[in-house]
């Protein structure tokens, strides 16, 4: 089933401590791909992952809630100001990110 990254991003930035968010699909051992959300916080005080996921769960169906939250200082953008999901995937790859259920 298709999950809207825009819906997840909008739900995440609704959290008072999140200034920007990007949702992307990552490899999942059972479901082929599942969403995670990458967030930039307003300050150095980062909310707990479950706090963000619980906040998102109020706005989307249970099966759409991302499986993980990754904190970054900034999310890469294209020259036109859009989130560069290609560069974001590269950053996650460079970090050796693995879906939590794959470990």
Residue ranges and their predicted role:
Residues 1-64, 74, 81, 87-90:
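AMP-binding/adenylate-forming catalytic core of the ANL superfamily
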Residues 69-72:
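General small-molecule cofactor/ligand-binding pocket signal
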Residues 92-103:
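Acidic/polar alpha-helix N-cap and adjacent early helical turns
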């Amino acid at each position: 089933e298709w999950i809207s990254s825009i819906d997840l991003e909008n739900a995440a930035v609704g959290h008072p401590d999140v200034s920007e968010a990007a949702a992307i699909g990552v490899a999942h051992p059972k479901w082929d791909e599942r969403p995670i959300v990458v967030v930039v916080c307003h300050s150095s005080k980062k909310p707990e992952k479950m706090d963000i996921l619980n906040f998102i769960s109020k706005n989307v169906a249970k099966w759409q809630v991302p499986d993980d939250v990754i904190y970054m200082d900034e999310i890469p953008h294209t020259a036109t100001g859009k989130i560069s999901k290609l560069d974001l995937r590269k950053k996650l790859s460079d970090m050796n990110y693995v879906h939590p259920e794959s470990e």
